[in-house]
Design a protein with these regions (language model features):
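Conserved short loop/turn motifs at secondary-structure junctions
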Residues: 90-96, 284
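Short glycine/proline-enriched coil/turn segments at helix->beta-strand junctions
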Residues: 82-84, 95, 108-111, 171-177
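Membrane-embedded transmembrane helical bundles of large multi-pass transporters/channels
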Residues: 1-56, 157-342
Length: 342
């Protein structure tokens, strides 16, 4: 019984000590708030630099385990045969001589290893009709008056060089030409993602402002929330430069997910501040110091659980989970720090 009371006393004493440390930390943040704000804005510069220098990987297949037969085959194609990606170009309603000229232009594009069409096998002076039906049907479709051209690259499917080559080929070809294949799809995904991500992030921000303005007693406070969370998002995305690259899925989801996951922390801080204003009337600094202390105490446990959930993704054999898990775990940590400091 004595040991039980001793344990209870020590536990209570330890909690009081931790509470005092948190209040001391909160007072330090309030006291140096201007300096912290200046440093926070200054850190946006290297964060922005890191963001723009982080490569985005648009090849979802590269996150598959290396021991899969398909991945081994891809490596063999590149290493032993010097052929990585390939695309197919469907050409409609174009004269053979113009198609031949187009093939030569495409062959001159950087990182195009070869372009295979009829004139790769025979001279154009030889009519296609003399070809066996099996070979003729590979290149032509009489019903749609179209022909097929195969383009082989010396780089992998989602390499930056391959995507640049795809863009250049599209600049050479006309509206009569349709480029297909995984490399073309990856290039389209890149263009689509880059165009739409800012749009739906803006929608998320506007909806957050609208909801918070309707549910809170101030229309300005939501803007400060978003400023703090926005800076945390920039820090998180900028720190990805350490990883070297992130997937386009992670890039597309990270900002909106971090906004949704960490918004609660700022709301809790605001409500705690209002409660402490009633406790310490007329002393806003003291009220905020205690609000920061209360927020840290309550939010740390919740944030650790959230981080643990994202870390669990890192154990997937499909390493897209690792990519997304690490970025989002960092995002939660940056969100907590920004909430109680900025």
């Amino acid at each position: 019984m004595q040991s039980f009371f001793l344990y209870s006393y020590l536990e209570k004493h330890e909690k009081e000590r931790d509470g005092k440390e948190m209040i001391k930390f909160g007072k330090g943040v309030v006291k140096h708030r201007v300096l912290i704000l200046i440093i926070s804005f200054a850190l946006l510069i290297p964060a922005a630099f890191g963001y723009f220098n982080t490569r985005v990987n648009y090849d979802i297949l590269s996150y598959l385990p290396g021991e899969l037969e398909s991945m081994k085959g891809q490596d063999i194609l590149v290493d032993e045969f010097g052929t990585g990606a390939f695309s197919l170009c469907v050409i409609e309603g174009m004269e053979d001589k113009d198609i031949s000229t187009l093939r030569e232009q495409i062959a001159d594009v950087d990182h195009v290893k070869s372009v295979v069409w009829y004139d790769s096998l025979a001279d154009l002076s030889v009519p296609m009709d003399v070809l066996p039906d099996e070979i003729y049907d590979i290149f032509n479709n009489d019903e749609s008056d179209s022909t097929l051209m195969a383009i082989l690259f010396d780089t992998s499917m989602s390499a930056d060089e391959t995507m640049d080559a795809i863009e250049e080929i599209r600049g050479i070809t006309t509206k009569q030409c349709y480029l297909s294949g995984m490399s073309a799809v990856v290039t389209d995904i890149k263009d689509l993602t880059n165009k739409e991500v800012p749009f739906y992030v803006l929608i998320a921000v506007l909806l957050s402002v609208l909801v918070l303005s309707l549910t809170m007693d101030s229309a300005i406070i939501p803007l400060f929330f978003l400023l703090s969370i926005g800076m945390a998002i920039v820090y998180n995305l900028g720190s990805n430069v350490i990883k070297g690259e992130i997937s386009y899925v992670t890039q597309a989801l990270a900002a909106v997910l971090q906004l949704g996951v960490t918004m609660d922390y700022s709301i809790f801080l605001w409500h705690s501040y209002q409660e402490n204003q009633e406790r310490f009337p007329g002393d806003k600094n003291r009220a905020m110091a205690h609000a920061i202390s209360n927020t840290i105490t309550s939010v740390v446990g919740s944030s650790i659980t959230t981080v643990a959930g994202f870390i669990a993704l890192c154990f997937m054999s499909f390493t897209l989970g690792l990519d997304l898990g690490v970025v989002m775990a960092k995002g939660v940590i940056f969100g907590v720090i920004a909430c109680v400091t900025i």
